[in-house]
């Protein structure tokens, strides 16, 4: 048995968790709802205010999925109660961000602005023109959106310009040295 999978997922009264016959775990909170589809080799049972997962057989795959689904359900419970966020910083002359409706407009030194459609369930806040925060209940989707925004202009090692995660250290390289 997986060490992570053995531990039950404990949730409070503000969260409703249900298991459907199609082996899907539905986690509902005050603001949002998340669904985790599971393979048939792991089953979930609700026991009071905790979810207990058990592998149905002793194959390598079901042991691996046991821990994975437990972590996914824990992330869903945390997501619907507290939510997840990821900060991004824009470093460079003229690099700006602003949100207009469900679109994020980025000026990243290209000849055109980069327009990004904000997915459903994700909220992007622009604190300053050079820093923004991606918020949402799904840890996976928040990370995916932040990575997509970063991929428009990843930080380059010589000047450090680009979109970086908040607090990310960029490994800098020395420029050309003039030879004699």
Curated annotation (Swiss-Prot):
Matches recorded under InterPro entries: Ribosomal_uL6-like (IPR000702), Ribosomal_uL6-like_a/b-dom_sf (IPR036789), Ribosomal_uL6_a/b-dom (IPR020040), Ribosomal_uL6_bac-type (IPR019906)
Gene Ontology, cellular component aspect: cytosolic large ribosomal subunit
Disulfide bonds: none
Any one biological process term the GO annotation gives: cytoplasmic translation
Molecular function terms from GO: rRNA binding; structural constituent of ribosome
Pfam families hit by this protein: Ribosomal_L6
Lineage: superkingdom: Bacteria
Tagged with keyword RNA-binding: yes
Keywords, ordered alphabetically: Ribonucleoprotein, Ribosomal protein, RNA-binding, rRNA-binding
Family: Belongs to the universal ribosomal protein uL6 family.
Self-association state and partner proteins as the record states: Part of the 50S ribosomal subunit.
Function of the molecule: This protein binds to the 23S rRNA, and is important in its secondary structure. It is located near the subunit interface in the base of the L7/L12 stalk, and near the tRNA binding site of the peptidyltransferase center.
Protein known as: Large ribosomal subunit protein uL6
Originating species: Bdellovibrio bacteriovorus (strain ATCC 15356 / DSM 50701 / NCIMB 9529 / HD100)
Gene that specifies this protein: rplF
């Amino acid at each position: 048995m997986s060490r992570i999978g053995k531990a039950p997922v404990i949730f409070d009264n503000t969260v409703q968790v249900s298991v459907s016959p199609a082996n899907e775990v539905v986690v509902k909170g005050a603001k949002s709802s998340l669904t985790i589809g599971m393979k048939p080799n792991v089953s979930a049972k609700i026991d009071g205010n905790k979810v207990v997962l058990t592998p149905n057989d002793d194959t390598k795959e079901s042991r691996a999925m046991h821990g994975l689904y437990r972590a996914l359900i824990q992330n869903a419970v945390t997501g619907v109660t507290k939510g997840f966020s990821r900060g991004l910083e824009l470093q460079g002359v003229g690099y700006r961000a602003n949100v207009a409706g469900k679109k994020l407009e980025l000026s990243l030194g290209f000849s055109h602005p980069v327009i990004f459609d904000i997915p459903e369930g994700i909220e992007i806040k622009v604190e300053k023109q050079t820093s923004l925060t991606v918020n949402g209940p799904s840890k996976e989707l928040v990370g995916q959106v932040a990575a997509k925004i970063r991929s428009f202009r990843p930080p380059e090692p010589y000047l450090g310009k680009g979109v970086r995660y908040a607090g990310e250290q960029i490994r800098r390289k020395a420029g050309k040295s003039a030879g004699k």
